Amino acid sequence: MHTAPSCNPELLQSSSPGVHIVMEGREVFKYAVKAMEEAVLALLEQEQVSIDAISLVIPHQANVRILNKLVERLGIGAEKVVINVHKYGNTSAASIPIALDEANRASRIQAGDIILLCSFGGGFTWGAALIRW
């Protein structure tokens, strides 16, 4: 594709293969969950921190289904996870800072807490970080 359909109205009507961007949602979902889970587990092993030592998890707020599946696979209680995607939608790179600020303002974070941040985003990039508050 050489141009976005919105720039060329004829492309909006086209059913030709290769003209429109297509996302394989199920595959992206599976890959996102797997990539974040692996990043989190590798980080915890590297830093010698157990999952039980985590006080709060603040994941990228892309999709509540991805968040729920990640939490399930990691065995983290829902009470330890900040989810606000239902309030703001996917705010892209701002989702973790917004959720961190909300958790702090709600006194969900105390001095000395270990906070897990994890993300998966456009371009198939992902990562995880630990913060001691």
Question: Could you tell me what each predicted segment is?
Answer:
Residues 1-85:
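Hydrophobic pocket-lining "lid/loop/helix" segments that shape and contact the acyl-thioester
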Residues 40, 96-103:
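Buried hydrophobic packing segments
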Residues 65-68, 93, 124-126:
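Short active-site-adjacent structural elements
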Residues 73, 77, 88, 102-106:
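Hydrophobic alpha-helical segments
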Residues 84-96:
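Active-site-adjacent helical/loop segments in soluble small-molecule enzymes
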Residues 100-133:
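Conserved beta-strand-centric core segments of catalytic alpha/beta enzyme folds
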